[in-house]
Curated annotation (Swiss-Prot):
Source organism per UniProt: Vibrio cholerae serotype O1 (strain ATCC 39315 / El Tor Inaba N16961)
GN (gene name): clpS
PANTHER family, per the entry: ATP-DEPENDENT CLP PROTEASE ADAPTER PROTEIN CLPS, ATP-DEPENDENT CLP PROTEASE ADAPTER PROTEIN CLPS1, CHLOROPLASTIC
Protein name: ATP-dependent Clp protease adapter protein ClpS
Protein family per UniProt: Belongs to the ClpS family.
Assembly description: Binds to the N-terminal domain of the chaperone ClpA.
Length: 106
């Protein structure tokens, strides 16, 4: 039989695990910002399409954007938040709307 593993110490315990603290990933809010040009119906469509909101919730968030200047659409890990911002921005530009979507650390 081959002795390929002679270099492993006989004191080595395969069941021994090093305890490491695993931190949860940083989270980010995806935020829609108000402008004077994007129609309210389009904002609702964005919220339904990209954030899986029903019509009632999408309308509430749209009104918050309209009256308060911005609203959080969701909270995600950095990669997911970046993707959502890019999708919303691209879809808005394709439809000739200046809707501003940003991300902020939660």
């Amino acid at each position: 039989m081959s002795k390929n593993f002679e270099w492993i110490s006989p004191d080595f315990d395969l069941l021994e695990k090093e305890k490491t603290a695993v931190k949860p990933p940083s989270m980010y809010h995806v935020v829609l910002n108000n402008d004077d040009y994007t129609p309210m119906d389009f904002v609702i469509e964005i919220l339904e399409r990209f954030f899986s909101m029903d019509i009632e919730r999408a309308t509430q968030v749209m009104l918050k954007v309209h009256y308060e200047g911005k609203a959080i659409c969701g909270t995600f890990t950095a990669e997911v938040a970046e993707t959502k911002v890019a999708q919303v921005t691209m879809y808005s530009r394709e439809n000739e709307h200046p809707l501003l979507c940003t991300m902020e650390q939660a």
